[in-house]
């Protein structure tokens, strides 16, 4: 049975549009690294995608090298050990620190790391579970979407034009937004998430902005 917090998430995003069962080996592997509440959601819900790929719960193993690259030479590299637990359809990575929880989001499209200073503290197991519950309960669809140059949310329009995102796909912009590209539908392409985020991470050191 779902708890109220994940229920709020489902009320906002709807049921999963893509479902991936999490193997028990993955749950066992991450027991000592991620909160029990997150592993419970993995077991009962899965590594699912919602809203045709607008937000996905992900396997941290798939993003370890990308997270390491984006955090390299930042204050966060040595402050905690971070793992990706969620991804947006435009390549934002939601991170969970083993000690401090969910306080970083890497916005790869905008070359920015958003840092929640108020949530940056070492947490007990109980606090870590509450942190995960709060993370999901407080998500909103608009927080993962991007407004185009006319202030119109663009994700659903991209899905209409290019189709839903597959498991390893994101929508990217050509040229990249932080290189001067326009935020418009015609600039969007479906891209392999790993290749795209790796390429974006090689241009310049990301900005750090307090959320």
Regions found by a protein language model. Give the residues of each.
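Mixed-charge (acidic/basic) macromolecular-recognition segments
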Residues: 130-184
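Compact, glycine/acidic-enriched structural inserts
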Residues: 104-145
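Intrinsic-disorder-associated interaction segments
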Residues: 2, 121, 125, 145-152, ...
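A surface-exposed partner-binding patch
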Residues: 1-104, 164-211
């Amino acid at each position: 049975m779902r708890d109220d917090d994940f229920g709020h998430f489902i009320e906002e995003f709807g049921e999963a549009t893509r479902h991936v069962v999490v193997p028990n080996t993955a749950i066992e592997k991450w027991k000592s690294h991620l909160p029990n509440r997150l592993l419970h959601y993995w077991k009962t819900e899965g590594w699912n995608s919602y809203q045709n790929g607008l937000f996905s719960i992900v396997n941290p193993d798939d993003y370890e090298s990308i997270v390491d690259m984006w955090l390299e030479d930042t204050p966060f590299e040595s402050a905690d050990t971070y793992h990706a637990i969620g991804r947006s359809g435009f390549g934002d990575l939601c991170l969970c620190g083993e000690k401090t929880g969910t306080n970083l989001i890497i916005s790869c499209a905008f070359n920015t790391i958003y840092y929640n200073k108020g949530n940056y503290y070492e947490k007990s197991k109980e606090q870590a579970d509450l942190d995960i519950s709060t993370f999901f309960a407080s998500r909103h669809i608009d927080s993962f979407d991007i407004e185009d140059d006319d202030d119109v949310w663009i994700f659903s329009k991209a899905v209409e034009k290019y189709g839903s995102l597959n498991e390893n796909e994101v929508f990217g912009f050509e040229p990249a937004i932080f290189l001067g590209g326009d935020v418009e539908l015609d600039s969007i392409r479906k891209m392999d998430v790993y290749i795209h985020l790796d390429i974006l991470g090689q241009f310049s050191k990301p900005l750090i902005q307090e959320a």
